[in-house]
Each structure stands twice: as structure tokens, then as C-alpha cells.
Amino acid sequence: IRAALEARGDAREVILVPESAHGTNPATAAFAGYKVEDIPATAEGRVDLEALKARLGPDVAGVMITNPNTCGLFERDMKAISDAVHAAGGFVYCDGANFNAIVGKVRPGDLGVDAMHINLHKTFSTPHGGGGPGSGPVVLSEALAPFGPLPYTARTKDGVVHLIEEEDAEEFAKEHFGGALQHFGRMTAFHGQMGMFTRALAYILSHGADGLK
């Protein structure tokens, strides 16, 4: 998100985090150097949409939201929340902690989500005992895809999935994205244990891809 904002010369410093979001969200935003501000919940435990809209402004980089939230409730105003944040120039990050409740039923991208991490141990059967092995793939919207860390995977129009590293990133971007990537560097390791990706894929294939595409 910061890389995308900097690319357009926009220095925003606030991340909004609803009270109903996963407890790690404010810590994550603060660790990334953002100022964190709370958005209150309604009496029924969902994001107060009007309070969110009232706080949006030129200093807000985005919102970190968990859907379903930590109260176990689906954020019914999710699309309206995303539309409001986008209209104000910000981005929407969704915590995938409770994704297993909606996977196959609704697509985060259709709700306006720009970035989301997926907890494979919570949603796609990989082990979590003993502290891991952890694996948290991150998916990005078209707006944020050119600004993600390397390496990452991208599917071209011919259906081929590519693993993008630094040495081929610029050539790939010119051919498929119409311009240079503006990634913020390479991660020291990949997004967790590759073996967990394989196990999650086997789990998905065994159940079928209906509702996942």
C-alpha cells in the first residue's frame, strides 16, 4: 500500500482499524510505521459505516478489516466500506483469519478488497501445531499487484502461471502489465513453507474449485 501511494506522490500516514477487526491488525499497521485510529462498531457488532466515512480524508492510507469479524459477524456493508475508502484515495486490506466462513460463497475481490493474506492453517487444512510450519500467501488486486514484494506469482492471459524474480521482473512487467513494476524489494524467503502451498492445493483440488475462482 505504501509503495502504491508513494508512486503517485501521496504521503498518507493513517490506517483505520475497526474495533471488530482481528487483534493483530493495529499492531501490524503500527509495525509498518502507520498511525492507527479506531473505528467504532455499531450496537450489533459491525463496522459503523457512517463513522468510517466521517474519518476518511487525505491522510488515510487505508483500512484493515476482518470479515467475518472477531464477533463472528459478516460485514454486510463491506462493499460500501470499500467504495468509500477507494473514493477517498485509500486501499482496503482484509485479514483472512476468518476466511473459512465465506470461502466459496463470496469473493473478496468482488467486495473491493485490494490485499488479503490467507491463513492456510485456518482455511485450507495445513498444520498449525507447534508454531507451524506457517504459510500465509498474500493476494493483491490489480491496483496493488505491481507494487508487491518479490518473488510473486502472476497468471498471464495465456493461462500460464509465472514465478517472478528480480532478474525478470522488469521484462515481465513491460510485456504483461504495460509498464515497470514498482515493487519494494525481495522478501528474504518466500511466503512461508512451500510444502504447505502444495498441501493446500491438494486440499482445494480434492474438494473442487467451485466458488473459489
State where each predicted segment sits.
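Structural motif of enzymes handling amino- and sulfur-group chemistry
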Residues: E165-K213
